């Protein structure tokens, strides 16, 4: 405990008696736990739902190969106790969003330190700390970039005060009918995995979209196609999974359906190909006859890094067949009704997506990608740098010491940059902003306006897409402000299930209606004003109006913001939590560079816009939100899930 002896007496006592909650035991979490006990913090609780994977071992130093498959939180506790046996550590192998961890649970702690890897959990912890009145230290890293900030109720902005850029999405008809970029094919392949082996989702259909308006000369033709049934080639007669099951997941039949028959059907939509190069169907038998031709390449591909090699189309077909057989066996072992979950670190699942995506790229005349590239794009991977995690975890502890000293006004949002700014600083501290009076989370009376079509939005969509996904509620209850207190949604299981498939207009909800949404777990109430519109954009179900735009700021430093994660190699690392995991794991808005842009240029602009803080070279964040640094488009890092 060398550090605690260097602290002032009162602070040292506060350190030794305080109780902290660390949420996350991954890249930052491991470094943070080590720093905390070496500083003198001995009363710690750590929670993490994940288990240890081999890919974690290169930077999460509390774990060893023998720990693979075990709880991160439990092993982190055991490892820390080896060099600090006097520590009192409680480990939870669980999701922080579990209702057991309510406001009373959070009130046990002096402060909370986040080391998370998904936006939904960050939002939830933010709200729980606000409800409990407990200071929160938020953090994240992405490669060489990092960020730390402090959230304190009524004093600073909360995590949700500023809008976060939404994930990049693609129209369904582009994915299914007219892919033009490799990422379109990779998204399609991930959808295909779920349609065949996982949980089916109507929004992730992979068969040709026969109702694509672009494929018809007029809207009536699109409607006629959509209503077609029981005709030769009508791919909507049965679901993809039903058809695959009926064939016993025969790889060759699957191949010919997906890459020959469906492509031939697409070619019948001739209007799609008047200004595009038409796809070229593939047939298993023709590729199989060329199998010997690919042997030379396959042998040469063994040289160097295997995952960096781009396979030819025949090799991709063979990889597709092999992965289907392996995944089929995994399903059989799990039993009837079982489902698989796609994981970038599961070799058969990754092989399947790599093969299927590349075959589709070949069909649509795109350059095929290596397994490494596909994995990066499919998993939204940002290379992890262990030293970045170490620096950020150290900054978390320093901000925590300021809070314990009662010097919250000295707390800062600190950015770690890839290159020194014009002042030759890698660390750029900014003063904390006050709460946003328009924030729909921490405002005195949280209120928001949502534009939607009341005749199309169902109660289920309101609950899942708007309340849970957009506004990060866990178990919402919704009451219509109609003078009667009509209950639209109840968190009690089964109580309002009959409402789920009904349009909200059926309950008298119209333009200017108000809904009161409560989440008792989060101790959070949100008033929702309904703005009805008959003219919503295509593929847009709703839009948040006002200070929290659905698409985020006009020109945010999107790459740098969305890339900030918990230091894992995957900004969207799969979690077994039922919560919606977001691949664009965000923290508070940042003004540092994107990985591909010029850090010096951005910070030069910053210097001209911002004042110095007393006694230190810092940057005020009062104008931070107006800064619009140039951002280079990077289609290789895209949020998918």
Curated annotation (Swiss-Prot):
Pathway per the UniProt entry: Protein modification; protein sumoylation
PTM section of the record: Sumoylated with SUMO1 and SUMO2/3 and by UBC9. Sumoylation at Lys-236 inhibits enzymatic activity. Sumoylation at the C-terminal lysine cluster plays an essential role in nuclear trafficking.
A Pfam family annotated for this UniProt entry: UBA2_C
Compositional bias (Acidic residues): 582-594, 630-641
List of catalytic residues: 173
A Gene Ontology BP annotation from the UniProt entry: protein sumoylation
Gene3D superfamilies: Ubiquitin activating enzymes (Uba3). Chain: B, domain 2 (1.10.10.520), Ubiquitin-activating enzyme E1, inactive adenylation domain, subdomain 1 (3.50.50.80), Ubiquitin-like 2 activating enzyme e1b. Chain: B, domain 3 (3.10.290.20)
Binding site for Zn(2+): 158, 161, 439, 442
Gene Ontology MF, one: transferase activity
Subcellular location: Cytoplasm; Nucleus
Regions that span the bilayer: none
Keyword annotations: ATP-binding, Cytoplasm, Isopeptide bond, Metal-binding, Nucleotide-binding, Nucleus, Transferase, Ubl conjugation, Ubl conjugation pathway, Zinc
Annotated region described as Disordered, given as residue ranges: 546-641
Compositionally skewed regions (Polar residues) per UniProt: 556-579
Glycyl lysine isopeptide (Lys-Gly) (interchain with G-Cter in SUMO) cross-link, chain position(s): 190, 257, 275, 610, 612, 623
Superkingdom in the source lineage: Eukaryota
Gene Ontology CC: cytoplasm; SUMO activating enzyme complex
Placement of covalent cross-link Glycyl lysine isopeptide (Lys-Gly) (interchain with G-Cter in SUMO1): 236
Functional summary from the UniProt entry: The heterodimer acts as an E1 ligase for sumo1, sumo2, and sumo3. It mediates ATP-dependent activation of sumo proteins followed by formation of a thioester bond between a sumo protein and a conserved active site cysteine residue on uba2/sae2.
Protein name per UniProt: SUMO-activating enzyme subunit 2
Species, as recorded: Xenopus tropicalis (Western clawed frog)
Gene for this chain: uba2
């Amino acid at each position: 405990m060398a550090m605690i002896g260097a602290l002032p007496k009162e602070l040292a006592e506060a350190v030794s008696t305080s109780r902290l909650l660390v949420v996350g035991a991954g890249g930052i979490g491991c470094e943070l736990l080590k720093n905390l006990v070496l500083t003198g913090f001995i009363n710690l609780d750590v929670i993490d739902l994940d288990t240890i994977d081999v890919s974690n071992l290169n930077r999460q130093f509390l774990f060893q190969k023998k720990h693979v498959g075990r709880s991160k939180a439990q092993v982190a506790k055991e490892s820390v106790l080896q060099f600090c046996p006097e520590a009192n550590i409680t480990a939870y192998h669980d999701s922080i969003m579990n209702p057991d961890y309510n406001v009373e649970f959070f009130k046990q702690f002096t402060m909370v330190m986040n080391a998370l890897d998904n936006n939904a959990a960050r939002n939830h912890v933010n709200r729980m700390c606000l409800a409990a009145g407990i200071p929160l230290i938020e953090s994240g890293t992405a490669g060489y970039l990092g960020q730390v900030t402090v959230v304190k109720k009524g004093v600073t902005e909360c995590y949700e005060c500023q809008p976060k850029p939404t994930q990049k999405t693609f129209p369904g008809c582009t994915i299914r009918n007219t892919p033009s970029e490799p990422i379109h094919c990779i998204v399609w392949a991930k959808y295909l995995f779920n349609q065949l082996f996982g949980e089916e989702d109507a929004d992730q259909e992979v068969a040709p979209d026969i109702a694509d308006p672009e494929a018809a000369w007029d809207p009536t033709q699109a409607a006629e196609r959509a209503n077609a049934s029981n005709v030769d080639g009508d791919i909507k007669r049965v679901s993809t999974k039903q058809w695959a099951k009926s064939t016993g997941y025969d790889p060759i039949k699957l191949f010919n359906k997906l890459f020959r028959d469906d492509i031939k059907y697409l070619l019948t939509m001739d209007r799609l190909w008047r200004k595009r190069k038409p796809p070229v169907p593939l047939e298993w038998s023709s590729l199989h006859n060329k199998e010997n031709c690919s042997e030379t390449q396959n042998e040469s591909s063994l040289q160097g890094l295997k995952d960096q090699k781009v396979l030819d189309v025949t090799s991709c077909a063979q990889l597709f067949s092999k992965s289907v057989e392996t995944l089929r066996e995994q399903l059989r072992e799990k039993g009837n009704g079982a489902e698989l979950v796609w994981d970038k670190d599961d070799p058969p699942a990754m092989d399947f997506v790599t093969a299927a995506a590349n075959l589709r790229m070949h069909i649509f005349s795109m350059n095929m990608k290596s397994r490494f590239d596909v994995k990066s794009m499919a998993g939204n991977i940002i290379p992890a740098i262990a030293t970045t995690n170490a620096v950020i975890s150290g900054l978390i502890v320093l901000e925590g010491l300021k809070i314990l000293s009662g010097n919250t006004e000295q707390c800062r949002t600190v950015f770690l940059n890839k290159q020194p700014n014009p002042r030759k600083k890698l660390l750029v501290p900014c003063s904390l902003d006050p709460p946003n009076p328009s924030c729909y989370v921490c405002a005195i009376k949280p209120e928001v306006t949502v534009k939607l079509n009341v005749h199309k939005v169902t109660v289920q969509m309101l609950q899942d897409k708007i309340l849970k996904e957009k506004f990060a509620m866990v178990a919402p209850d919704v009451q219509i402000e109609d003078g009667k207190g009509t209950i639209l949604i109840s968190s009690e299981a089964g109580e309002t299930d009959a409402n789920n498939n009904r349009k909200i207009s059926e309950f008298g909800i119209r333009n200017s209606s108000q809904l009161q949404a409560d989440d008792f777990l989060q101790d959070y109430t949100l008033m929702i004003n309904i703005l009805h519109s008959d003219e919503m954009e295509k593929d847009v179900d709703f839009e948040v109006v006002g200070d929290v735009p659905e698409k985020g700021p006009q020109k945010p430093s999107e790459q740098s913001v969305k890339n900030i994660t918990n230091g894992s190699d995957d900004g969207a690392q799969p979690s077994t939590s039922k919560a919606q995991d977001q691949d664009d794991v965000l923290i508070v808005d940042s003004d540092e560079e994107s990985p591909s842009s010029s850090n010096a240029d951005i910070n030069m602009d910053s210097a001209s816009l911002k004042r110095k803080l007393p006694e230190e070279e810092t940057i005020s964040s009062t104008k931070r939100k107006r800064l619009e640094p140039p951002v280079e488009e990077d289609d290789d890092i895209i949020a998918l899930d």
